[in-house]
A protein has these predicted regions:
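Acidic Ser/Thr/Pro-rich low-complexity disordered segments
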Residues: 71-87, 228-244, 312-317
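Internal mixed-charge
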Residues: 88-108, 117-137, 279-305, 323, ...
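A structural detector for beta-sheet-dominated domains
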Residues: 61, 104, 173, 180-182, ...
Length: 400
């Protein structure tokens, strides 16, 4: 293999009077290396930074206020008290990342036609960007969180780990409208629920919010549902929902998930459903992260609903590109992520997502020299903290 990648005609030349006969011409080659690879670190650039992790498994606590209830006291009354408040713990793991390479001593010394002249500096910059992509991939794609186990490295749960469907199986008694969950539901009278089912009970709507009233006999697993908050709090019979059939595979959806089950593309109604779920819980999402393909769909949905009434003639054409929409629950902006697939959209409140560094990215120093080449390694470790996933929503299993 040739040491020099430029093959020159060493002559003798026919003459040096004309370019077609002369030799010794210099190359016109730019010193700048053009790289069209896109920037893919969407979340790494936008998520906040929490306090550094001090353990390979880190945890945090969440809570929410109890629903409102009727609170009217006599002028003269005795004080009563009860247990109050509930906390929920969440956790994630630190994932370690590294990239390495090597370059020969000769390759570092030979003159280059591009910058930087030292090949190590060029390659270090390259692998640093590549590792940033690997980190972004973990945030974007990791569906599990796990500790290191033998030869299996630890993985940090990414956005899909936090934004996934979580359900409790339940059964419906049609006579009294009592719903029984398969495990303790940890809800209070006045909380709202969403249902999913293979066969939806007659009189129940998927994606509709219902307010619950705990059953006196077994409040940990039984409740009734109502159309209004007041109906649930005050037990108004006229507001109770009593489906006429039990349906099949009925579950309560605990997270803000709109599941299209691969049957259809998403619509503006689906975005509004997700936003409504978050709104009811107190979140304030501002961006919807999606693939470029689904961003085109977003633009078409918005422009299709736009009315042009400026007396446009039939032979005139108006092209619009929409990136944001004002909904009943606030302004939402569509953002494309180069790593996103077509099957999901994440509607995020960016105030509740943080990167927790355990080991910030650095070059490993002091590596022993093994031969006529130089090895280099960069490494780092972090975990993702989805502080409050209920402040965000996701549309899943979108049909392409």
């Amino acid at each position: 293999m040739a040491i020099n990648d430029v093959t020159r005609n060493l002559g003798p030349s026919a003459s040096q009077s004309h370019t077609s006969e002369a030799i010794g011409h210099a190359e016109d080659l730019s010193k700048i290396i053009t790289n069209i690879d896109p920037d893919m670190t969407f979340f790494m650039s936008r998520f906040g930074e929490g306090p550094d992790a001090t353990s390979l498994n880190f945890s945090w606590l969440t809570e929410h206020l109890e629903p409102p209830k009727v609170n009217a006291q006599l002028e003269e009354h005795d004080y009563t008290s009860g247990r109050i408040g509930s906390l929920r713990g969440m956790s994630n793991h630190v994932q370690f990342f590294s990239k390495s390479g090597r370059v020969t001593d000769a390759q570092r010394k030979v003159a280059k036609i591009y910058s930087p002249d030292d090949e190590k500096a060029h390659l270090m910059k390259r692998v640093t960007k590549q590792m940033a992509r690997d980190m972004e991939y973990a945030i974007t794609k990791n569906t599990i969180s796990r500790p290191e186990n033998g030869s299996a490295p630890a993985m940090t749960g990414g956005v899909p780990f936090f934004m996934k469907s979580e359900t409790i199986e339940c059964t419906l008694e049609t006579t009294g409208g009592v719903i029984t969950t398969s495990s303790e539901h940890n809800m209070k009278t006045g909380d709202f629920v969403y249902f999913k089912a293979t066969t939806v009970p007659t009189g129940l709507k998927v994606g509709e919010a219902y307010y619950i009233r705990l059953n006196d006999s077994d409040p940990l697993t039984k409740f009734k549902i109502y159309n209004t908050l007041q109906g649930a709090v005050e037990g108004l019979a006229a507001d109770q929902v009593k489906p006429s059939t039990a349906g099949t595979d009925l579950v309560v959806e605990l997270n803000n998930i709109v599941d299209l089950e691969g049957a259809a593309d998403y619509t503006l109604d689906d975005i509004n459903k997700g936003l409504e779920m978050v709104y009811r819980r107190g979140g304030n999402p501002t961006i919807a992260v999606m693939s470029a393909e689904k961003k085109r769909t977003f633009s078409k949905l918005i422009t299709a609903a736009t009315t042009i009434n400026r007396g446009m003639k039939a032979d005139r054409k108006l092209d619009l590109v929409a990136t944001a929409v004002e909904t009943d629950y606030g302004m939402i902006t569509a953002e494309t992520h180069r790593m996103y697939d077509h099957d999901r959209i994440d509607i995020l409140d960016m105030n509740y997502w943080d990167i927790k560094w355990f080991d910030r990215v650095k070059e490993v120093t002091g590596l022993p020299k093994k031969g006529s080449y130089l090895e280099f390694v960069i490494e780092g470790g972090f975990g993702l903290q989805g502080t409050q996933p209920l402040a965000s929503a996701s549309i899943l299993n979108i049909k392409r």
